[in-house]
Amino acid sequence: MCYAGHQFGNWAGQLGDGRAINLFEVEHNSKNWKVQLKGAGETPYSRNADGLAVLRSSIREYLCSEAMFHLGVPTTRALSLSLTGDQVIRDVLYDGNPALEKGAIVSRVAPSFLRFGNYEIFAARNDLKNLKILVDYTIKYHFPNIDSSSKEGYINFFKYVSNRTLEMIIHWQRVGFVHGVMNTDNMSILGLTIDYGPYGWLEDFNFGWTPNTTDNQNKRYRYGNQPNIGLWNLHQLANALYPLIEEAKPLEDILNQYKVDFKIKSLQMMQSKLGLFTNDDDDLNLIQQLEDNLHLEETDMTIFFRLLSDFTDLPSSLEIMSAAVYKSNNIPKDFKKKWGNWFSLYSKRLLK
């Protein structure tokens, strides 16, 4: 499945096929599943690369994709992990010191592995015939409620993709997952988390954190910027689909709606994390103060929200913060005051 894409905000042209080999398709529980191998060797578009994978990165993909599924995050899934018996040379730290590692193959499954880049490549080549064939195929097998024989159908297709992309990213923000390399060739057309490369999980709550060392300078794919990048990538997909629609406004309306929906869904997600099951006019302020406070000192995101479920009264808030803050023996007074104010607001909000 040849694709192109935008990498770190720049058009990179044809990229390859992700070292992936599609084996077959099966039907299970009235759903179609594609079975794919990653790391099995050269592929039609692997160019000069060996197409191999190593055990280290394969274990990361296997474990994380399954963890994400059980955390309720839309994702591709891992079926199996196998050693190949080969030794594969890789420069792990990109510092000019390559070393041999154990080779491995991951078998993964998903309803589809189509990416934004699969559509971009045909648009870039002005190959509208194959672009239309691919879009019609995608609609027929993955969005069957859409009529693909009209421009309105293509507009609805883009709307579905936008909604699913936003849903996926909201889940990422919920669990503190940072993809690390949100290029358009790594964006699933079905809104599934795909390509577990330099991903990571937040430890301390930090909107500016990225696990990708090659992105350390600009931090384009940092945690707090993932929703914006999702929108940017959708702009590129809209550009690719435009020749089939020939109207900019419907696409622009969908992109603008993404911004509106993000604010709504982000609020709902944070309300859920805080155990707030009704709406209140002050919830946005409560959440903003919480996020500001979480940045005051290195505070473990997972530990904080886990212990917050045990919150009963103001005295218990000190125990929560002592356990969640990394340097709990050296907490400034201003820090305690701000958290005390927040827990007071939170306590009153729980009673509403």
Predicted regions, residues:
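Regulatory N- and C-terminal appendages and interdomain linkers associated
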Residues: 1-2, 216-352
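Conserved helix-loop functional segments at active or binding sites
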Residues: 140, 144-148, 167, 171-174, ...
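Beta-strand segments within the central parallel beta-sheet cores of soluble alpha/beta enzyme folds
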Residues: 78-83, 183-186, 252-256
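Phosphate/ATP-binding catalytic cores across multiple sugar-kinase/actin-like superfamilies
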Residues: 161-172, 269
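Catalytic activation segment of kinase domains across protein kinase-like and atypical kinase folds
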Residues: 93-96, 100, 174-179, 183-243
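Short acidic-aromatic active-site loops that bind/stabilize oxyanions
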Residues: 128, 147-162, 227
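Conserved ATP-binding subdomain of kinase catalytic cores across diverse folds
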Residues: 1-151, 190-194, 221, 233-234, ...
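Secondary-structure transition/capping motifs at alpha-helix termini
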Residues: 29, 70-76, 145, 171-182, ...
